[in-house]
Amino acid sequence: MGFINLSLFDVDKLMVWVSKFNPGKILSAICNLGIDCWNRFRKWFFGLNFDAHMWAVDAFIPLMPHYTEQMERVVDDFCSETPESKLEDCLELDTSVNEFFDEEVYKKDEEGVMKLQRSAARKHIKRVRPGMMQAAIKAVETRIRNRHTIFGDDMGKVDEAAVRATASDICGEFKINEHHTNALVYAAAYLAMTPDQRSIDSVKLAYNPKSQARRTLVSAIRENKAVAGFKSLEDFLGGPLSFPVEDAPYPILGIPEIRVAEKRASRVMKSKRVVGLPAVSAGLKVCVHQTSLHNMIVSLERRVFRVKNSAGELVVPPKPIQNAFDSISYFREEWLRKLSHKGQILKSSLADVVACYSSEKRKLYQKAADSLEKKPVQWRDSKVQAFIKVEKLECDTKDPVPRTIQPRSKRYNLAIGQYLRLNEKKMLDSIDDVFKEKTVLSGLDNRAQGRAIAHKWRKYQNPIGIGLDASRFDQHCSVDALKFEQTFYKACFPGDQQLETLLKWQLSNTGSALLPTGELVRYRTKGCRMSGDINTGLGNKILMCSMVHAFLKETGVRASLANNGDDCVLFCEKGDYEQINRNLEQWFLCRGFEMTVEKPVDVLEKVAFCRSQPVCIATQWAMVRQLGSLSRDCFSTQDWLNPKTFKDAMNALGQCNGIINDGVPIHMAQAKLMHRIGGNRKFNLDALHKQMEYSWRDRLGKRTNLLWSEVEDATRLSYFRAFGIEPYIQRIVEEYFSQVEITCEGRSTNVLPTHYSRIHKDLIKAR
């Protein structure tokens, strides 16, 4: 029996005719013709104008048949709880394993002095209880299914490898012996890759005609439904979208150190907006703080004057104990010896310092240099002019406090830059020489950083990586800490009175901030790093590296440090973690710094450094930016509503990210899409420099070729270990990026919905 060609009839007349019959009998007759006829009817039905035929929705939708199965049974099966043994209940201590490790504890000796003592402690290795192997296999299988998204015939070899890696990780978490781990990985992994009855039922539930019909209805309605002021969802997602910035949701504390002067004449300033690409983003909420009186006061209160203690109370930053840095002075002497082998440290001319800058900055610094030729630097040049940093922040988990940049005048920066700017590389290299390996990783591209971190990892037999979280490092730089840092500079230029004066002005700061609305905020601080100082990066590296070196020396722990200012990761043997965890926080607190020892990781790809993680790309290690970058790169405070500016930005982002992420899953696909939106233009260094003035050198190194290399299976597996995104999901997202179409026509809205992207934020989420 054939199916009537409904397109030959007048739809309105046909629907009036259909309405006279029983809708249930019509659907039954169509279903009896077969699934092809049913799908054709469904496609025609949902192409109707529902506003004119709303009765059809009410009549037909409740009667959509289950077609092949009674789906109520499937739902009941899902809801019925079948008790299964927990993995921990299937395990017991394996007494046959005689493996020990050196346990280190501090104990008082006979004289009452705390000394490090080592003793052999048995490793707590477990095995599967007799008769419970089947239950243990089922428990591991369940855990695998909960961590992975898809199982079926479309799984490739790399997907199978990812499943086996997950099974191995589960056994490692529970410290199961090697023999039983081998059995569990082999059995549980392949069981998990074989669809069970629940997997089959879930497919039935998702793809039965009734479920498909409802999804089609939702899609049809969305095409005609207004979203956030737009005529449809497609219109909302189709191009760059502008929305306003907001104030940070924190109350003002009203501390006396901050004063607000009477309102002056306000400047004419256009309200800043953020422009994003909803269709290309990975779905995270991205916010930018506006320059307002509220944000300025909140930032100064919580990033300059007050910190949170362990009880969550806002208090003044901790002070170091007396003579806290005396025990670290040896590091300075050793550093000076290494520095002496790198040639003479000379004061630069103003012209040489000005030449370090480019573009508009060079013009401003040249003007300051001309001024210094006529009038020497004065104390008033060291005054701080603060402003709110315009940065893209991830606001899904918490609302960050606005950041304040606190620069001094360009006259002051040039004066102190004569001593430090051109000598900085030698000073940083000398830190590496003290550690006897590459330690300060700033200035390296992502591949060089990846190689350095992999080298540190391979130095140890049972390696772990320990992140050191220096909470608000600039805020915790006390007067004593800054004085200790300054001894490094003074030792390079002994007896130089001008340098001593310039450094002294950094110990006591007078700051102000003029807001666009006319308010003038004034404040004073003793100590505290001013984030706009020319020696901020160098000083933070000197302080952090010297303190970590002294801590390791005092405790006798053999470890390697990766440092980039206040970003630190320690690499050491697994057995040394407890000693570091037990002593480091108190050791740093005595010197005025609040440090948190993060949970150690025993997989190289899980090491987080400067918001990046190592991934093995075609046998070469490289640092890949964490998943939040997939959202942040899709937002800007530039005028992306202007088609030319938008295409130039997309071209620059696509080129830069395409080079640093060549051969990387998902990241390269997004970069390729951006490059396509930008017109697939050839690499242009000048255009890239214009768009990314501050970071392109460090990002690209010497690479200037867009290769778009094919993603290798081994890279997908390494990417999975780093971020937990299964290879199957990687390919789905890449396919989406290859097909999405974006217009350059910009639009505006007053609010960005919580789930604004086609890619839900939970899909590309580190696990």
Swiss-Prot record:
Key words, A-Z: Host endoplasmic reticulum, Host membrane, Host-virus interaction, Inhibition of host innate immune response by virus, Membrane, Nucleotide-binding, Nucleotidyltransferase, RNA-directed RNA polymerase, Suppressor of RNA silencing, Transferase, Viral immunoevasion, Viral RNA replication
Protein origin, superkingdom: Viruses
GO BP annotations listed: symbiont-mediated suppression of host innate immune response; viral RNA genome replication; viral translational frameshifting
GO cellular component: host cell endoplasmic reticulum membrane; membrane
Residue spans crossing the bilayer: none
RdRp catalytic domain sequence ranges: 463-580
Keyword field contains Methyltransferase: no
EC numbers for this chain: 2.7.7.48
Effect on the protein of changing residue 164 to A: Complete loss of binding to the Y-shaped RNA element (YRE)
Effect of residue 41 to A: Complete loss of RNA replication and membrane association
Catalyzed reactions per annotation: RNA(n) + a ribonucleoside 5'-triphosphate = RNA(n+1) + diphosphate
Effect of residue 180 to A: More than 90% loss of binding to the Y-shaped RNA element (YRE)
One MF annotation (Gene Ontology) recorded for this entry: RNA binding
Pfam families, sorted: RdRP_3
Purpose of the protein: RNA-dependent RNA polymerase, made of isoforms p88 and p27, plays an essential role in the replication of the bipartite viral genome composed of RNA-1 and RNA-2. Replicase proteins p88 and p27 interact together and selectively recruit viral replication templates as well as other essential components into intracellular membranes for the assembly of the 480 kDa viral replicase complex. Mechanistically, isoform protein p27 binds to the Y-shaped RNA element (YRE) located in the 3' UTR of RNA2 via a direct RNA-protein interaction and to RNA1 in a translation-coupled manner.
Membership in a protein family: Belongs to the tombusviridae RNA polymerase family.
Name of the molecule in the record: RNA-directed RNA polymerase
